[in-house]
């Protein structure tokens, strides 16, 4: 007998859907997002970057009478302004709409969905799940500051290596094909301002921290070693080194 999968449901009230419509909407987004819209699907995970490869936001994109790009409220205007720079060349209409969004966690994988559902978890719970899943949704403070490797995203989930050029593609390709990575993402269940190695030297780069449901987390981009704080060894609650040592 097969066991049923546990599904967690999260009510997400702090998200916006940006609609992109027009006969050339696909062509516009093909040059802006990291996924490949030539792969016919009704849902895409995508990253939008600037020309220097800094991540403007991650997103969930739905195909339904145009394209619905779901992002956090606080980065919605930023992404809209970026897309509108190019929309005049593609005869597209771009608007922002508030629609019901919820999230699901199933078999350790997270996905946003459109619609109303009676969920027993909220946006704060979602933030924690995303933090531990290395898939945190970009907020205003993070937008345009970090590159994709510093955020710990699964590149296979967000990026197509078969499509042609898109904004930030050259930098992403360079980060991907540099060879063996010397730094990856680790997450601690405490808000550390800095971490040290066994020689008491400050190491790594703090990317962001999260306080939610009376819990603290911190996310660092750092080499694979033993980590210390105030002379005591500290253990990450999740990290890329264990998830994929060959990444």
PLM feature spans:
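A glycine-rich (often HGG/GG-containing) alpha/beta subdomain
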Residues: 25-63
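Short, conserved charged micro-motifs
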Residues: 24-29, 76-80, 117-120, 192-198, ...
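Acidic, low-complexity central loop/insert segments
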Residues: 4-21, 40, 57-137, 239
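Short amphipathic beta-strand starts and helix->beta connectors
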Residues: 1-6, 44-58, 200-207
């Amino acid at each position: 007998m097969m066991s049923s999968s546990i599904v967690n449901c999260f009510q997400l009230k702090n998200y916006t859907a940006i609609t992109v419509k027009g006969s050339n909407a696909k062509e516009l987004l093909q040059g802006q997002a990291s996924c490949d819209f030539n792969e016919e699907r009704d849902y895409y995970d995508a990253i939008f970057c600037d020309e220097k490869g800094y991540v403007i936001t991650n997103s969930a994109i739905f195909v339904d009478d145009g394209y619905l790009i779901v992002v956090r409220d606080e980065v919605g205007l930023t992404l809209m302004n970026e897309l509108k720079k190019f929309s005049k060349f593609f005869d597209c209409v771009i608007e922002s709409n508030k629609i019901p969004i919820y999230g699901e966690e199933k078999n350790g994988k997270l996905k946003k969905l459109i619609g109303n559902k009676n969920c027993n978890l909220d946006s704060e719970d979602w933030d924690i799940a995303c933090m531990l899943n290395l898939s945190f949704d970009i907020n205003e403070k993070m937008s345009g500051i970090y590159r994709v490797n510093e955020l710990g995203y699964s590149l296979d989930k967000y990026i197509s290596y078969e499509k042609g050029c898109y904004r930030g593609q050259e930098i992403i390709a360079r980060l991907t094909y540099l060879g063996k990575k010397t730094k990856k993402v680790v997450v601690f269940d405490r808000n550390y301002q800095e971490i040290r190695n066994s020689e008491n030297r400050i190491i790594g780069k703090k990317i962001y921290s999260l306080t939610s449901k009376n819990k603290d987390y911190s996310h660092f981009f750092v080499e694979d070693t033993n980590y210390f704080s105030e002379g005591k060894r500290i253990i990450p609650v999740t990290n890329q080194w264990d998830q994929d040592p060959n990444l």
